[in-house]
């Protein structure tokens, strides 16, 4: 299926260079001087087996009304509205600027899907800038070098995933179908019934993280035996190993997984298969433990793994290993919490457990924390409480009007758990912007105490009984 992609971003981040790279010709003028591109330019692009229309746009700038820059911005905004997908480009070497933040907010409010890419990452440059890009709230940034053609494989994967989603005739219908499937899977779900854990079914937990952070050592400590091979060499564990275990009379299915590296470092065929096996373990788990090494800096790959867990709808717990080797634990913990809040805004309040897998200190806190996250993941909120909350939320902050008409939210209901999923009903559901949906999700998380779990929120259109009468009259 053909689709249209608009490359957007502030001036001089490499939009025209990427445009030329994708169309295979130097159709767009490229120079180091900001603002070279003034008019939108379209071309037919090919990437692997994908064919699509690409739009090169003028650099987004803050500008006074009536100026040339303001007219250029209007043209860019029209391109965004015309596109099926936006590719927001930032300069990783320069880091995230106030303009980047400003325009990411604009794009979050737009109904057009967005892929975030960090350009000028050749030779490992711009690592700090890529980390900063997480605070834009647009997911994991793709590292690119438009000039050298690096990172196009990651871009292809993202575009191919988007193209699959376009196979539905209508994007809104696709959301409705997905919600209907989830409702069918949860037939008989009653949000007003208290959650009662199924103690007969095993609690499924996957332990994942970068290589050599101590995953197998932690599993051995929990089991009380040297079940898993461990050592200082990174990558000893090759498969996702499932282990049946019992904790305080409750059955647990525990997965020790292969270390996940960033894709550029995954070269051996066996290691690629190991990573795929780890991804399957994440999808089968109910709670995912991301294990960090307290002695190493927080890396982009950790954020990428957390983003994957959120997308898969699993409960999340951050565990920091080798805590006995930290000189200033309170300061390190404070910085870690701030980094998580800033870089993972989509999962606020993720619980953190600190421990030493080698000595066993702090490991007694792990399973109770996993059980709490599992309870949050299964949370049920009574419909009456939900609607009282929504009335208060709307009274504090009304949805923005659309086309000069107010957007009224009728009611809200929880349609499933695992993870908590809610439907908000409105006669103008399509006009509720992404920013307002995010406001509702944050409110749900804070009010009903749902840390460490993804929250799904769908807008559903209510039928207007007078609409048919107007058509007949």
Swiss-Prot record:
TM regions (residue ranges): none
Binding-site residues for GTP 1, renumbered to this chain: 9-16, 56-60, 119-122
Entry annotated with the keyword Repeat: yes
Extent of the signal sequence: none
GO biological process, alphabetically ordered: ribosome biogenesis
Annotated KH-like domain residues: 379-463
CDD domains: EngA1, EngA2
UniProt-listed InterPro entries: G_ENGA, GTP-bd, GTPase_Der, KH_dom-like, KH_dom-like_a/b, P-loop_NTPase, Small_GTP-bd
Boundaries of every EngA-type G domain copy: 3-167, 203-378
Molecular-function annotations in GO: GTP binding
Binding, GTP 2: 209-216, 256-260, 321-324
Annotated keywords: GTP-binding, Nucleotide-binding, Repeat, Ribosome biogenesis
Tagged with keyword Nuclease: no
Domain of life, per lineage: Bacteria
Assembly and interaction partners: Associates with the 50S ribosomal subunit.
Family classification: Belongs to the TRAFAC class TrmE-Era-EngA-EngB-Septin-like GTPase superfamily. EngA (Der) GTPase family.
NCBIfam families: GTPase_EngA, small_GTP
Function noted in UniProt: GTPase that plays an essential role in the late steps of ribosome biogenesis.
Name of the protein in its database record: GTPase Der
Gene symbol of the encoding locus: der
């Amino acid at each position: 299926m053909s689709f249209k992609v608009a490359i957007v971003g502030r001036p001089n981040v490499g939009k025209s260079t990427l445009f030329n790279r994708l169309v295979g010709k130097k159709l767009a003028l490229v120079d180091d001087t900001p603002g070279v591109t003034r008019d939108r330019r379209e071309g037919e692009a090919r990437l692997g087996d994908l064919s699509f229309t690409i739009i090169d746009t003028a650099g987004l700038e803050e500008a006074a009304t009536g100026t040339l820059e303001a007219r250029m911005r209007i043209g860019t905004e029209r391109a965004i509205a015309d596109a099926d997908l936006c590719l927001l480009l930032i300069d990783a070497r320069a880091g995230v600027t106030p303009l980047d933040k400003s325009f990411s907010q604009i794009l979050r409010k737009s109904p057009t899907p967005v892929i975030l890419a960090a350009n000028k990452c050749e030779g490992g440059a711009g690592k700090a800038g890529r980390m900063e890009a997480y605070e834009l709230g647009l997911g994991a940034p793709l590292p690119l070098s438009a000039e050298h053609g690096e990172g196009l494989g990651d871009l292809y994967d993202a575009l191919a995933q988007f193209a699959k989603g376009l196979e539905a005739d209508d994007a809104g219908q696709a959301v409705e179908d997905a919600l209907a499937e989830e409702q069918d899977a949860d037939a008989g779900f009653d949000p007003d019934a208290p959650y009662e854990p199924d103690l007969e079914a095993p609690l499924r937990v996957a332990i994942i993280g970068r290589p050599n952070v101590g995953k197998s050592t932690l599993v051995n400590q929990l089991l009380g035996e040297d079940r898993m091979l461990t050592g200082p060499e990174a990558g000893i564990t090759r498969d996702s190993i499932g282990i049946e275990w019992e904790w305080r009379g409750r059955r647990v299915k525990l997965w020790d997984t292969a270390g996940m590296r960033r894709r550029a470092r995954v070269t051996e065929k066996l290691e690629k298969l190991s990573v795929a096996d780890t991804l399957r373990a994440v999808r089968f788990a109910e709670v995912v433990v991301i294990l960090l090494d307290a002695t190493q800096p927080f890396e982009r790959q950790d954020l990428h793994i957390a983003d994957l867990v959120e997308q898969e709808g699993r409960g999340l717990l951050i565990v920091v290993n080798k805590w006995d080797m930290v000189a200033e634990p309170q300061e390190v913990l404070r910085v870690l919490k701030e980094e998580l809040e800033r870089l993972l805004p989509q999962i606020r309040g993720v619980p953190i457990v600190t421990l030493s897998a080698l000595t066993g200190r702090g490991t007694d806190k792990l399973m109770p924390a996993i059980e709490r996250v599992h309870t949050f993941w299964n949370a049920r909120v009574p419909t009456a409480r939900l609607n009282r909350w929504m009335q208060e939320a709307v009274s504090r902050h009304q949805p923005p009007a659309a086309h000069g008409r107010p957007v009224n939210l009728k009611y809200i209901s929880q349609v499933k758990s695992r993870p908590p999923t809610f439907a908000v009903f409105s006669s103008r559901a399509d006009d509720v912007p992404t920013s307002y949906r995010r406001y509702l999700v944050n409110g749900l998380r804070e009010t009903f105490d749902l840390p460490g779990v993804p929250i799904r929120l769908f807008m559903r259109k209510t039928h207007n009984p007078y609409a048919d009468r107007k058509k007949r009259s």
